[in-house]
Structure formats: C-alpha cells, structure tokens
Amino acid sequence: ISLAEQYGLEKAEEIMIEGMEIAAKDISEGRAKAIGEVGRPHFPVDQDIWDASNRVLLRGMELARELDVPVIIHCENEDDTDQSLAELADKAGLDRGLVIKHSSPPWVTPEETHGVMPSIPASKSNLKEALSKGTDRFMIETDYIDDPEKPTAIMAPTTVPKKVAAWVANGQVPMESIYRICKDIPDSLYHR
C-alpha cells in the first residue's frame, strides 16, 4: 500500500513484479527455492489495490510455473481464500499443490484447501484442529503472532521441533504423519 501511495499504483505494481523477476533469476541461478512471499492485503482496501495485488500474485504464480517451484502466499484468511488462490493458480497454469498458503488457518481437507498447500502456525490449537480432520497434508511453521495487543510477539523457531518432539513422546501423531508433515511434503516442494 505504501508503495502505491509513494509512487502511484501502476508504478508500485511494476516495482513488485520487478522484484519477483529478480527473485526468479536468483532461483534459476540456484540461490533460492521459491517465489515469495507474495500476496494480497489481509485488511480492507480499495478495489484497484485488490485488483493490482491479484495481478502481481498471478505473475508470481506464472514465474513459479516457469521455474517449477512453489510460490509462498501471504494473504487474507477468508472462507473463499483458498478457492480464489486455486483459481489464480489454474489461470497461471501452476499446479495448485505448489501454492503454499503461509500462516494458514487449520484448513487441511480437500474441500477447504482446493488443492492449495496449507502451512499452519504451530500453535497447539491449530495442530489439534488440523490433525482432527484426518489428514496430514499440511506443513507447520513459525511466524510473528498476529495479535495487535502484542505487536512484537513471535512463535520462536524452536516451536516446531518442540511440538514434533511432544507428538513423538506422547504418541499423539503416527510417525508416518510426522515424516509426511516435516519431511516428505517440504522436500517435495523445496527440493525439486
């Protein structure tokens, strides 16, 4: 948004796309493994900003398709978000499974994800809900905690290993699911 305020919307869109083109060059030269984070505002904006954000997002998906790499999305979490991301992926010709929804709610079923790959913050409640749905098609992550009352709060990088160790210790999650969530899925996306 501040780019659009500073340079105008058209120039801001050009700057964002140019940044992704640079990232694509880094990927092609072996210095990166994915396009992103790319996305849309997760707060109300004017339609012209929303449309420009979707054009930038579409270009990121096109670059990901050209390079056969994932694109990491940071955007809103509405009921139709994953469906709209899946539709953009289809438009770009990108496999929906290469669209990684960063900071995803625990939406893990095919009906919820529409083929998009959820990456879920590793909170106890998120993990419990995701696992209760009977699938292990998701990744777990750490991030800033999106709480206006705690603007600098983070989920430490040690959170994921601690959660996984607890799963192993209490037998809460089958080892094959742990391998899928923590190794097989990330490897399939980032070691193509």
Q: Where do the protein language model's features map onto the residues?
A:
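Active-site-adjacent beta->alpha loops and helix N-cap segments on the catalytic face
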Residues: 51, 80-83, 126-135
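His/Asp/Glu-enriched short active-site or ligand-binding loop at hydrolase and phosphoryl-transfer sites
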Residues: 105-106, 114-128, 144-146
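Short, charged, surface-exposed secondary-structure boundary motifs
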Residues: 109-112, 127-134, 149-154
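Mid-to-C-terminal alpha-helical segments outside catalytic/metal-binding sites
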Residues: 161-192
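Short acidic/histidine-rich active-site segments
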Residues: 74, 136-154
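Active-site gating loops and adjacent loop-to-helix segments of metal-dependent hydrolytic enzymes
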Residues: 1-12, 30-31, 145, 154-167
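Divalent metal-binding pocket/active-site signature
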Residues: 5-107
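Glycine-enriched alpha-helix->loop->beta-strand junction motifs that scaffold or abut catalytic
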Residues: 67-70, 91-96, 111-119, 134-139
